[in-house]
Amino acid sequence: MIDEALQFQSRRAGAVQPGKVMLVGAGPGAPDLLTVRASRILSQARLLLYDHLVSPGILQLAPPGAELICVGKESSRHTLPQAAIIELMVSLARSGKSLVRLKGGDPYIFGRGGEEAQGLAAAGIAFEVVPGISAAQGAAASAGIPLTHRDHATSVVFATGHMREDGRGDGRTGCRGDLDWSLLARPRQTAVIYMGLGTLPRVCTQLIAHGLAADTPAAIIERATCPGQRTIVGDLRSLPALAALHDVHSPALVMIGSVVSLHAQLGVRAADAFAPVAAIDGVAAGMSVRLSGSQSVTTITPFISGCGPQL
C-alpha cells in the first residue's frame, strides 16, 4: 500500500516513471529459433533497438507501428559507439519509455550485454536479460558439427578473434591483451572463434605454433541457420585461403577441432533440417571442391591430403 501511495503521489507531482529495458537474445538467426519469451516480448515491443546481426525475419515479428532503431555495431563501422548506445537506452528509459534491446545470439556471449547491463544498473534503470540460443549452438546444429563428442572433444571454448594485429586487443570487444593461445590449442577440445574472419590467418598460425597440427579440421559457418548459409570445411593450414577464395563475409563463426570431421557424416542431415541442392564439383586453387547442401544451405569441402574423406 505504501509503495502504491508513493507511486500515486509521484504521478500527481508530474514525475515521470522510468521505463524498463529488456536485453533480449535474438538467437542465431532463424526467426523460429527465438525463445518463447523472446517472441512474446518482441510481439509486444513499441520501441526496439537492434544490432546489424539481427535478421530481417526477426524484425518483422515486431508489431505494426513499433519504432525500430538500428544501432549498428558492425566490425567495420558503428552506427553508434557502445557508450552512446548505453546513453541512448538510459535517456529513453528516463523519459518513461520501455524498450527492447535486441541482440544477436545470447546477450552475454560476446554481445556486450554485460556492459549494457552494467550501464543500466549504474543509472538505476530497471532491466531484464532474456537469454537466446547462442550463435555457436546454432552454427553447430545447422552445420552438423557437434560442439562436444566423447570421441573427439571433452571441452569447448568460445573466444573472440576481433583483435588488433599487435595483439593488444581493441576497443570494440574490450579485449586487453592477446588470446590465450595455449588454452585454445589444447587437444580434445573444440574452439569456437567469434568475429574471427579479419584475423583468421593469425589465429590459424598461432594455433599451429602453440601445438595444434596443421591438418586439424577447421570450418567457417557463414550465416548460420539463415537462408544462404555456407559451411566451408578445411584445416588450419588451408582455411584462411579458402575464406578468401570463397569471399566469406560476416556473420560467420570459425570452429576448430576434431569434431569438424563429423560434418562429412552429419552435415547433410543437418542441412535438410534447416532447408534441400544438387552437388556441384569444381576445382579451385589446385583443390577439388564439392558444394552440396539443401535448398539454401551450401557446404564447401576441400579434399586435400589428411583432411576429410575422399568422396
Predicted regions and their residues:
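Short secondary-structure boundary/hinge segments and terminal tails
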Residues: L59-Q60, T79, F110, G138-A139, ...
